[in-house]
Swiss-Prot record:
Xref: HAMAP family: MurC (MF_00046)
Name of protein: UDP-N-acetylmuramate--L-alanine ligase
Superkingdom per UniProt: Bacteria
Keywords: ATP-binding, Cell cycle, Cell division, Cell shape, Cell wall biogenesis/degradation, Cytoplasm, Ligase, Nucleotide-binding, Peptidoglycan synthesis
Pathway this chain belongs to: Cell wall biogenesis; peptidoglycan biosynthesis
Alphabetical list of SUPFAM superfamilies matching this protein: MurCD N-terminal domain, MurD-like peptide ligases, catalytic domain, MurD-like peptide ligases, peptide-binding domain
Length: 485
């Protein structure tokens, strides 16, 4: 980046993608400021690093900035954007700034409708275990680093490639993973699935001639594009044709054990793997990491250590531990938090929970995300949500969208009742969800909180309320009228 750029301001700095880029640039020596609509733990953490943060948007916040970075959530009439344009300060989309960062290193980009954050985190963890000290920008908090971004001294940068707004077409990686291609964010592609698949092909063709595409051929849509990809391809999955393949897959508590067969280029010895994550979908994510490791020549021992020692990502099957159950019988229930909000993600996570906690009643607390997704995936939501043993259903988190008739939480709850597999409890106000969980969960249950909206605050609140309820009652009380002292 030209050294005339010294001060970079972020509009919407509290977002997971924006905060990560801001932190890396700050650690590169740039002066960073940023604003967001509401205060958050992310804003407070960035302020603790020395980044100037503002709650709310105002033209004065961009004073002195040489460039202004925006996310797709920021509207064109935002006062900071308008002020920047009036002053002829460059307004840079988030993806272009990420692409600029990637020019500094060898870029590994993780794309796909589902699994990007977990896979990016696993790649970063294995590179770190190999002593390669990667830079990474992730859409979730990597627990081992305590952050969603890190500036490393090594040659590689690992990032998520976002297809939701087609911004991944701005990136120029040297290696790219595609985990899957599913019908989500279809408004970006004119509700044309063929256009979505073509965008992934175009993304892969952004790589240089020496680039490598690592593709999950278990996914039908990914299989469809393989013939169109002109760069070298390494396939992975459970199928016999996959060059990096998992066999002998089994769940052991909250972990997955399997053997990786590697036949990309030369046949390598089978590699026994312990993955510190549940679910077959995460085995596939790990296979892509193993394929990356083969391409980079990472020793097997580092791969095994990075996957077995993986400490997880915030809001990706994140355990909040045991919470005391109310009522009888006495005991506790387990609380798990997950960001999944698409039916495919939810089905995989529910299956992972069944595997990790066999024989236990599964209570799903779900907040749908976006009216358009609820409308477009309505029947799939009914099928998937019905796989839980009990359901607490919140109202749709709008994410800025106007309501759509018959695509709201109450209508979804009625459809679940008609389907007859489960009797949902509709919780209109997400603020009431923690108490609803405590009222409905029994000893021995697993409570799985899912959604991409404000439900992320619910698991912590459940723990907080339960802990307060278990405190010893105060020994002093106000005397009733007439009571002897």
């Amino acid at each position: 980046m030209k050294h005339a750029i010294r001060h970079i301001h972020f509009v919407g700095i509290g977002g997971s993608g924006m905060s990560g880029i801001a932190e890396v640039l700050f650690n590169l020596g740039y002066r960073i400021t940023g604003s967001d609509l509401a205060d958050s733990a992310t804003l407070r953490r960035l302020a603790g690093l020395g980044i100037g943060t503002f709650v709310g948007h105002a033209a004065a916040h961009i004073d002195g900035a040489d460039a202004v970075v925006t996310s797709t959530a920021v509207q064109s009439d935002n006062p900071e954007v308008l002020a920047a344009r009036e002053k002829r300060i460059p307004v840079v989309p988030r993806a272009l700034m990420l692409a600029e960062l990637m020019r500094l290193k060898q870029g590994i980009a993780i794309a796909g409708t589902h699994g990007k954050t977990t896979t990016t985190s696993l790649v970063a963890s294995v590179l770190d275990a190999a002593g390669l000290d990667p830079t990474f920008v992730i859409g979730g908090r990597l627990n081992s680093a305590g952050a969603n971004a890190q500036l490393g001294s090594g040659d590689y940068i690992v990032v998520e490639a976002d297809e939701s707004d087609a911004s991944f077409l701005n990136l120029l990686p040297v290696m790219a993973v595609v985990t899957n291609i599913d019908a989500d964010h279809m408004e970006t592609y004119g509700h044309d699935f063929a256009k979505l698949k073509k965008a992934f092909v175009d993304f892969l063709h952004r790589m240089p001639f020496y680039g490598v595409a690592i593709l999950c051929t278990d996914d039908p849509a990914v299989r469809d594009i393989v013939a169109e990809v002109t760069c070298p391809v390494t396939s992975y999955g459970f199928g016999e044709e996959a060059q990096v393949r998992a066999i002998d897959v089994r769940a052991v508590g909250g972990q997955m054990h399997f053997t990786a067969q590697r036949r990309n280029g030369v046949t390598l010895p089978d590699l026994p793997i312990v993955l510190n994550l549940p679910g077959e979908h995460n085995v596939r994510n790990a296979l892509s990491v193993i394929a990356v490791a083969v391409e980079l020549g990472i020793p097997d021992e580092a791969v095994q250590r990075g996957l077995a020692g993986f400490k997880g990502v915030g809001r990706r099957f994140q355990s909040y531990g045991e919470v005391a159950a109310q009522g009888e019988p006495a005991g506790s229930f387990t609380v798990i938090d997950d960001y999944g909000h698409h039916p495919v993600e939810m089905a995989a996570t529910i299956a992972a929970a069944r595997g990790a906690f066999p024989g236990r009643r599964l209570v799903l607390a779900f907040q749908p995300h976006r009216y358009t997704r609820t409308r477009d995936c309505f029947e799939d939501f009914v099928k998937v949500i019905g796989n839980a043993d009990a359901v607490l259903l919140g109202e749709v988190y709008a994410a800025g969208e106007p309501p759509i008739v018959a695509a709201d939480g109450r209508t979804l709850a009625r459809a679940l009742r008609v389907a007859g597999k489960v009797e949902p409890v509709f919780v209109d106000d997400i603020g009431a969800m923690p108490q609803a969980i405590l009222d409905n969960a029994r000893a021995g249950d697993v409570v799985l909180c899912m959604g991409a909206g404000s439900i992320g605050a619910v698991p912590g609140k459940v723990v907080e309320i339960a802990a307060a309820a278990s405190l010893p009652q105060q020994t002093t009380r106000t005397r009733r009228k007439g009571e002897a002292s």
